[in-house]
Amino acid sequence: MLGAVEGPRWKQAEDIRDIYDFRDVLGTGAFSEVILAEDKRTQKLVAIKCIAKEALEGKEGSMENEIAVLHKIKHPNIVALDDIYESGGHLYLIMQLVSGGELFDRIVEKGFYTERDASRLIFQVLDAVKYLHDLGIVHRDLKPENLLYYSLDEDSKIMISDFGLSKMEDPGSVLSTACGTPGYVAPEVLAQKPYSKAVDCWSIGVIAYILLCGYPPFYDENDAKLFEQILKAEYEFDSPYWDDISDSAKDFIRHLMEKDPEKRFTCEQALQHPWIAGDTALDKNIHQSVSEQIKKNFAKSKWKQAFNATAVVRHMRKLQLGTSQEGQGQTASHGELLTPVAGGPAAGCCCRDCCVEPGTELSPTLPHQL
């Protein structure tokens, strides 16, 4: 049974709609629905993950782990869990609403984008992940899709979401479960070896690589061949895409995408690298090259995974401008439905923590030479 999680117990409510005004369905997960809602007391907009308790049977451990992790976290660059309610046969996780859209979308929309912009983004990610690591938490699924902008403001901060695969390290225990997203997972995970916080640092290196060229360091249609590349840590800084990128940026990436986890930079070491802490990140506009590669390698496939993130951002703009009229165009459900793909995660507006998906397990097809 759910309940044996760290942190305060959740609150009881006879009817959650007495507390929150349910607006729109933002997305549907494996056993949850995500609702854009307004707190009737404060008029604050939130994202509510609505979970049928009967659907959690056999999955209680995963849910308890996620809640326990979220209860421990309070960082300006990490999506927050505000409250938990139990009402009827449902559990309601009240999450901070993140309304600025996804990382890739914002980069593509920009007209000007530089190494320095990428450096500032990675600084925020490193600072947040260092905070997690200091608490003994390993995220285990860091990737661009889990980096969301807090608001529509031009200088909005970035937020880390989706703690469905995160794990708190227990003293004396080792992490060994193969999980994560192919393409971002560290070699030691694929090699089915015990691993540590260093897996997150590898993933940050992969993200930094993509932010500077627009394509992934490892790619193959065949998972086994993809895993072979990752196991060997075989990646290149291809010409012409990397010709205008500084040597400092490449050095930074090499230290994070180091095959040996013992030699790999920690978050603390990465934060001290000149590309982050110094003045070596270049100010040359690389937007055209990077955005073209993002659109070619990521955007379309990503946007097809869920409903159009642009529609959600547009909806949020209307809400912020006060032009959204309550009751107009309502359906029998929760107002204006944004029609997510069945089973797909919510995108853009809601934090991905709200979208409980099946655990992202690696393909069982691993290369033979482990």
From Swiss-Prot:
Phosphothreonine PTM sites in chain numbering: 177
Phosphoprotein as UniProt keyword: yes
Task: Specify the Protein kinase domain's residue ranges.
Answer: 20-276
MF-aspect GO terms: ATP binding; calcium/calmodulin-dependent protein kinase activity; calmodulin binding; protein serine kinase activity
In chain numbering, cross-link Glycyl lysine isopeptide (Lys-Gly) (interchain with G-Cter in ubiquitin) is at 59
The UniProt keywords, alphabetically, are: Allosteric enzyme, ATP-binding, Calmodulin-binding, Cell cycle, Cytoplasm, Developmental protein, Differentiation, Isopeptide bond, Kinase, Neurogenesis, Nucleotide-binding, Nucleus, Phosphoprotein, Serine/threonine-protein kinase, Transferase, Ubl conjugation
Instruction: For the motif Nuclear export signal, give the residue ranges.
Output: 315-321
For this protein, what reaction is catalysed? Answer: L-seryl-[protein] + ATP = O-phospho-L-seryl-[protein] + ADP + H(+); L-threonyl-[protein] + ATP = O-phospho-L-threonyl-[protein] + ADP + H(+)
Q: Which top EC class is named for this enzyme in its record?
A: transferase
Q: In which tissues is it expressed?
A: Widely expressed. Expressed in cells of the zona glomerulosa of the adrenal cortex.
The protein's matches in Gene3D superfamilies, at most eight in alphabetical order, are given as: Phosphorylase Kinase, domain 1 (3.30.200.20), Transferase(Phosphotransferase) domain 1 (1.10.510.10)
Q: Which residues form a coiled coil?
A: none
One annotated Gene Ontology cellular component of this protein: postsynaptic density
What's the name of the protein?
Answer: Calcium/calmodulin-dependent protein kinase type 1
Query: Could you tell me which species this protein originates from?
Result: Homo sapiens (Human)
Which gene produces this protein?
A: CAMK1
